[in-house]
């Protein structure tokens, strides 16, 4: 990504505590990427991009910091079956998914769940808003979509294109 786009990501993530997924190209020779097995790399990348979740809460941020400090890559799942909606509490995770886990940390419901922001007007479970930084397009509308869209428009003068 250009330095301008990197600065937008840094400024957004520091100034606003809104969960957002950034889709961006990755450096194939990056030390973290080079540690992936072929299987892991296939799971963690798509079309030469990675999807990084930012502002995902204190526990996940701390684990990510430890990962960076130790130069040990982590790949995380959404803890749900495909097309079954994001789970915000351990008790809502499907049993089939729980059986696959080596460890489950019940850190309690996240803030957006407590705020009642996890469902859209149709009652469907929302996840993070995904933005593809290659072309500044919305790949998925998620929690706080309107706020995120307006921040990019007002603060960064970027009209995010809807690719849905």
Language-model segments: which ranges?
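Active-site-adjacent structural elements in enzyme catalytic cores
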Residues: 1-164
């Amino acid at each position: 990504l250009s330095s301008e786009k990197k600065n937008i990501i840094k400024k957004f993530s520091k100034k606003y505590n809104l969960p957002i997924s950034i889709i961006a190209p990755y450096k194939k020779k990056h030390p973290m990427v080079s540690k992936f097995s072929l299987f892991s790399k296939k799971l963690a990348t798509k079309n030469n991009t990675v999807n990084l979740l930012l502002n995902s809460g204190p526990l996940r941020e701390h684990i990510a910091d430890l990962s960076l400090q130790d130069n040990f890559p982590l790949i995380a799942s959404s803890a749900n079956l495909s097309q079954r909606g994001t789970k915000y509490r351990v008790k809502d995770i499907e049993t089939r998914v729980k059986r696959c886990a080596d460890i489950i940390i019940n850190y309690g419901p996240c803030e957006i769940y407590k705020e009642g922001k996890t469902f859209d007007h149709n009652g469907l479970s929302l996840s993070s808003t995904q933005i593809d930084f290659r072309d500044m397009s919305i790949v998925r509308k998620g929690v706080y979509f309107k706020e995120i869209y307006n921040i990019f428009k007002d603060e960064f003068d970027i009209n995010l294109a809807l690719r849905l």
